[in-house]
Amino acid sequence: MLYRCLFVVFGSAERQLPKSCEGNDLMNKRTLHRLLSAFAALVIGLSVLTGCGTKTAENVEKQEDAQTIQVYLWTNNLYETYAPYIQSQLPDVNIEFIVGNNDLDFYKFLQENGGLPDIITCCRFSLHDAAPLKDSLMNLALTNEAGAVYNTYLNSFKNEDGSVNWLPVCADAHGFVVNRSLFEQYDIPLPTDYASFAAACQAFEKVGIRGFTADYIYDYTCMETLQGLSAAELTTTAGRRWRTAYSDPASTARVGLDDAVWPGAFERMAQFIQDTHLTADDLALNYDDVTGMFRNGEAAMYFGSSAGVKMFQDEGIDTIFLPFFSQNGEKWIMTTPYFQIALNRDLEQDNARREKAMKVLNVMLSEEAQSRIVADGQDVLSYSQNVPLRLTEYMKDVRGVVEENHMYIRIASNDFFAVSKDVVSKMIAGEYTAQQAYRAFNAQLLAEETPADDEIVLTSGKSCSNVFHANGGSASFSVMANTLRGVYGTDVLLATANSFTGSVLQADYNQKMAASMIMPNGLMSRQCTMTGAELKETVRAFVEGCEGGFVPFNRGSLPVVSGIAVEVKEANGSYTLTGITRNGQPLGDNDTVTVTCLATEKQLDTLLAGNSGTSAGEDAWVKDTWCDYVSGGGAALAEPENYMTLR
């Protein structure tokens, strides 16, 4: 339209003027020339603005991407207290926390498809399984953070070439939870070494009480018992040499057990089974079974976390925590870091981003941050010299063990979990001698891996950003929300920001990787019919937070919506809902809409308290619904939409 007007003006300029007007011709031409010049400048300016509008929006998003440090958390538990604390300490850094998966295969998939985040956390970890990621991760060996870790523990994270890609946060301590009152009641001395531990088990058996048991239905209990009994030997020079070879990321050959340390480990396991009278019946015991026996005075000791001490003391049972007693006289605590942290090597290409990421890492490893990780009743047992040792009454009986740095970090590769469960279970059931167990374990480690089920169940033709953008929200989260709204068949879907793992990549997904697109820790769905007024209040609770529930702590923690668009105001770290539209029109109070809400069960109860419409059916696991959808054939992802404007 502007260009048509311009042509009309130029056409008018060429008209023949009557003689009576010739005297004013020069003045008119000059005036017209000035008008045309101004108009042409306006047209050019508008055309430039129009042509670059999209580019400007893209530049804004690129700037937001550059300013954002993404941290993937291995569990939703860290999202509620740990993540908000870290953000509060770094108000000038935009940190986006995403609940990923406790599985290194998940991060390998992200790496292979260009989606590896800036900072990774993982609990179920071994250098052996992390080897494929090595070249994509920063070497932290020369950082202050690595230098603060005691060498005893840092050695467990060193690659063959001396580089360090992963650092541990504080330890989850496992050992023996002991009912001291039972020992006093039957006048049985508390164990101080392996011989007195075995004697105590024998004495309790004589009075009809199990001296010791554990939840051997779980792979980690089998694995940690086997290693804990030989922690002293596995940390010798020979033990460390074998562990380094087993974990070497540069080696593609499969590594079995050595013949120096490991045969003795199975001998000690066999002796332990005999001394504690473990039988095939123990293989069916789960955590509730074991703690129930302990609570009822049917078992004097069980293998578990130090958190059990506080739990039972609160119930009035005189409970203490004791370490593993090695047969060579040493005492050790079995530990697993609550998680390990690694940084993406791509950060080294941008000094400003690397500096921000290192600030985030520093806070993540701080004493105050780590205190928000541990379970109630557990002490912060740090592997770092920067965190002072402050043991509470629950851990006072193992102070000497901790001060000696006798905190053994378990070998926790996927192979070790699986093979330990198989072999230790057969030892307990009486099917394997120590020698047979050693040979079976070694053979399984050396066996070629069975090809994984790689049947493709979902294909994404493009990658979508999982960074939150002020004008639109997160594209990958929008894809998931829009797709699930179609699956559930409701008008609207509301989801907490931790619902999705942000892994919408241009890739083929097998069943495992497709399932990993949903947050792994108890995400539930609840369907309701609401009026527009009720929906407004529900969305407000999601955006602004509610009493007793989750409160968004940064822009990345704002909810995801589908079927509506929302406008939110940001001020001093808090968020206010200022508008909702549906189909481009303001949501009416008297409208009737069907709504699906996604959150953990606890969050659903608080977010949907009060006037939240009429519930339709029972809550359901989102991951189950999603897996059924993608495995049903013909699954497709919806397109993303701009669902939020943040001002």
Describe these PLM feature segments.
Residues 452-647:
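Catalytic centers of hydrolytic enzymes
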Residues 94, 313-376:
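Extracytoplasmic/periplasmic substrate-recognition and gating elements
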Residues 244-283:
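Glycine-centered hinge/linker elements that transmit conformational signals in sensory
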Residues 88-152, 181-192, 292-293, 301, ...:
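Extracytoplasmic "Venus flytrap"/periplasmic binding protein-like
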Residues 123-174, 189, 224-225, 235-237, ...:
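Hinge/lid segment of periplasmic solute-binding proteins
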